């Protein structure tokens, strides 16, 4: 992280690749917020009703068996998360330590944002949500973090797709801000 900051990077995006990661995310977000499996579990990659029922059972069983401490981000991560969630959490914390922005992607990176917030509450000040995922608990999760999505494209992907789109929107907004003439400059130039 420090090397990238030295190279001039100030904005980072996080996302993940995998199958069934929304199951872990549901467990983690459920643990942090004292939500049961029905409240927090969604369809992921658009699974059937039968698979959703099974997924809800798995999430509730994981919550019941592991009894992760909702006040301890590392405990929740260790008991209910996985390597990819640890990596995203590390990026969020590293960026915040360097006063850099991290744009989180969907439901899965939101779970990592909860871990980061429990480890260092200040990390939330350096987070931007990108999009609203299709997971039923995503909006409510963002609200718990004090974040709002900027785009809603019905995305079911977590590979930093939404975060990359949001980064481009941010880049365009900054370009317009930096390169547009002010009203005073336009009047002085005589242009309309």
Language-model segment annotations:
Residues 1-192:
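N-terminal loops that bind phosphate or other acidic moieties
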């Amino acid at each position: 992280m420090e090397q990238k900051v030295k190279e001039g990077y100030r904005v980072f995006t996080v996302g993940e690749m995998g199958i069934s990661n929304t199951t872990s995310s549901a467990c983690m977000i459920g643990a942090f917020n004292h939500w049961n499996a029905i409240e927090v579990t969604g369809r992921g990659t658009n699974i059937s009703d039968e698979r959703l029922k099974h997924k809800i059972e798995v999430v509730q069983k994981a919550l019941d068996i592991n009894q992760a401490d909702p006040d301890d981000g590392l405990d929740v991560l260790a008991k209910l998360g996985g390597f990819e969630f640890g990596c995203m959490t590390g990026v969020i914390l590293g960026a915040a330590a360097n006063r850099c922005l991290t744009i989180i992607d969907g439901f899965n990176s939101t779970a990592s944002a909860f871990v980061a917030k429990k480890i260092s509450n200040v990390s939330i000040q350096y987070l931007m949500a990108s999009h609203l995922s299709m997971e039923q608990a995503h909006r409510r999760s963002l609200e718990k973090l004090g974040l709002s999505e900027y785009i809603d494209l019905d995305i079911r992907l977590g590979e930093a797709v939404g975060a990359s789109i949001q980064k481009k929107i941010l880049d365009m907004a900054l370009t317009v801000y930096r390169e547009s003439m002010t009203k005073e400059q336009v009047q002085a130039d005589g242009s309309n």
